[in-house]
Every structure is written in structure tokens, then in C-alpha cells.
Amino acid sequence: MDKFTQDIKDLEVTTVERARQAIANKENATFFIGRKTCPYCRKFATTLASFVAETQAHIFFINSEEPSELEELQAFRSEYGIPTVPGFLHIEN
């Protein structure tokens, strides 16, 4: 298992649709948007893994390289002002 995959193992892999549902349902949720080929995402994932290990926080992961998600993810990122990865979105209602 590569380092990035190891670092995100405690995150819940999810979709843009799930993120939109969380927003619509006014859930408290945190999303990390990234990809393993991004050096900044890999560095952030290492920091995030430590945070999750210490706090047991529940964080969702959206893979920005998932082919089936690309178009919807681009619209989502534009809508919520996430120009690049790594992206981080925390929703608290």
C-alpha cells in the first residue's frame, strides 16, 4: 500500500453526490478533496492522518482523479470556491 493510501485509510471514500446530500440535509460534515498524484495532497494527507488518529474525526475523501466524478466534481469545486487540490470543505449547520 502506498503512503497516500495508508494516510487516507481512516477516511470514508465518497462521492460529490454524497457531499451535496450532506449540504442539502444540513449535516455537519468534512470533506477532503484530493488525489494521490498531487504532492501537496500527499503532504496534507499525512497531516490529516495524524489529526484523525488523535481526534477520531470522521472525514470524507473525494478522489479528484475518479473518472466518473470529473464533471460533477468540477462543478462542485466551482460552486464552493475550491480552485485546486488539496481542497477541504467543512459544513456545520
Positions of PLM-derived features:
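Residues that cap or flank secondary-structure elements
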Residues: L11, P39-Y40, E65-S68
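Conserved short-loop catalytic and cofactor-binding motifs
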Residues: D7, F32, K36, S64, ...
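N-terminal "domain-start" segment that seeds a small globular fold
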Residues: M1-A19
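Thioredoxin-like thiol-disulfide oxidoreductase module
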Residues: H58-N93
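Local sequence-structure signature of Cys/Sec-based thiol-disulfide redox active-site neighborhoods
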Residues: V16-H58
